[in-house]
């Protein structure tokens, strides 16, 4: 027997995240590629393969055009790059709304082909029933209430939710139904602090906020926003780096070195051995 054993790292799963209700805040970031997933893995509890990949990686105007194939491809990459964090894959628009059976088939396909630990679905009138159908059949589901990016065409843009009494009641009801249906956690997006706290206090599962204040049980951001890869930064984002600026500076220096023939230099050049 070998004297050296490879250390096994246990990946977090739905019960671990569910148990964090009211405890140390859950750390979540989006990830779409293996190298970024590897870099985020130690710091994060959850890596969300969000359908935001359509906008931040593929340049789409919204998430409506994201496909199952795209989500599976990026889910596979994130699973390969990470070891510890729970990986949750968004179910794209049109993959879970038509029927419970279709939602189940697509959720199972995502989990089998990626190896992810759960899927995420956005709220809607029939979605709690779908969540219940999936969880009864062994599929861990993360919910999503408040601002729904997949409904951007229906609602005329990315608009904060719960601004009046009726809106607040709707978000609270969606959260209640989502939790009761069996979701192990709920993303709360684009709502006022008071509503985020009320949602968090009203459900028995952890809430993970994005644009929803520190009143949630955890936080998620799009990693490209957090790293400063875009010129525009949403109000709810704190930029922890300026990678766009770093990339531009590195590319400019590389271009200069190529044009003045200082790259490649002796250190980057292969030479034939002298006889």
Curated annotation (Swiss-Prot):
- What top-level class of enzyme does the UniProt entry assign? transferase
Q: Which reaction does it catalyse?
A: 3-methyl-2-oxobutanoate + (6R)-5,10-methylene-5,6,7,8-tetrahydrofolate + H2O = 2-dehydropantoate + (6S)-5,6,7,8-tetrahydrofolate
* Short name of one Pfam family: Pantoate_transf
Pathway involvement of the protein, from the record: Cofactor biosynthesis; (R)-pantothenate biosynthesis; (R)-pantoate from 3-methyl-2-oxobutanoate: step 1/2
Q: What is its main location?
A: cytoplasm
Write down the EC number.
Answer: 2.1.2.11
Which residues hold 3-methyl-2-oxobutanoate? 51-52, 90, 120
Q: How is the cofactor bound?
A: Binds 1 Mg(2+) ion per subunit.
Keyword Metal-binding in record: yes
- Mind telling me which InterPro entries this protein's record contains? Pantoate_hydroxy_MeTrfase (IPR003700), Pyrv/PenolPyrv_kinase-like_dom (IPR015813), Pyrv_kinase-like_dom_sf (IPR040442)
Task: Look up the record and name the cofactor or cofactors this protein needs.
Answer: Mg(2+)
Catalytic center at which residues? 189 (proton acceptor)
Report the subcellular localization: Cytoplasm
Q: Which GO terms describe its cellular component?
A: cytoplasm
**Which family, according to the similarity comment?**
Belongs to the PanB family.
Protein's job: Catalyzes the reversible reaction in which hydroxymethyl group from 5,10-methylenetetrahydrofolate is transferred onto alpha-ketoisovalerate to form ketopantoate.
What is the name attached to this protein's record?
Answer: 3-methyl-2-oxobutanoate hydroxymethyltransferase
Taxonomically, what lineage is the organism? Bacteria, Pseudomonadati, Pseudomonadota, Alphaproteobacteria, Caulobacterales
